[in-house]
């Protein structure tokens, strides 16, 4: 970052896009350059990912949503068990920000994997590049959903351009990293 004349700020995508928190007072061009630097870093990380999206209104209550999320995570683990078993430990980074997500993750992982094979870590983005990568991936997938529903924001348009540009420059690249 320093070589590019950019501040060394941990990535937190929503404040970056909206100019809040550590990015307050920073011009849009510098924030775009930071986004691009983070995105370049992401593309060079040896990671695979999968995202899920849910409309809370599609579920009669939180318990139904937790059950569905747990099922989806368990199926993802079982579908990729051979790959996951190559590792001594599966590290789960999450900041416990949303009870429903925390409960679903713990229930699914504890059901699908041996407890001695799992390590839970606080996924505070400022402490881990991996958490920053996850934040960026989730933001990009959410942006794709907004484009699909034609509810993208002016901020989305400013940072990513039209859907075709977003798809070519961001979405296709992160989807090559799907597990």
Where are these regions (language model features)?
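Phosphate-ester processing/binding pockets and catalytic centers
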Residues: 1-179
């Amino acid at each position: 970052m320093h070589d590019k004349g950019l501040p060394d700020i941990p990535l937190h995508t929503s404040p970056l896009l909206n100019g809040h928190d550590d990015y307050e007072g920073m011009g849009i061009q510098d924030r775009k350059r930071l986004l691009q630097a983070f995105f370049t870093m992401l593309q060079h990380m040896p990671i695979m990912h999968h995202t899920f999206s849910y409309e809370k209104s599609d579920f009669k209550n939180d318990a139904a949503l937790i059950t569905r999320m747990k099922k989806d995570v368990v199926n993802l683990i079982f579908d990729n068990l051979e790959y996951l078993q190559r590792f001594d430990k599966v590290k789960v980074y999450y900041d416990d920000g949303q009870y429903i997500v925390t409960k679903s993750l713990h229930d699914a992982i504890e059901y699908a994997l041996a407890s001695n094979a799992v390590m839970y870590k606080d996924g505070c983005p400022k402490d881990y590049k991996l958490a920053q990568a996850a934040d960026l991936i989730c933001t990009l997938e959410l942006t794709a959903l907004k484009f699909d529903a034609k509810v993208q924001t002016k901020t989305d348009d400013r940072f990513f351009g039209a859907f075709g540009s977003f798809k070519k420059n961001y979405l296709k690249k992160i989807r090559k990293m799907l597990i």
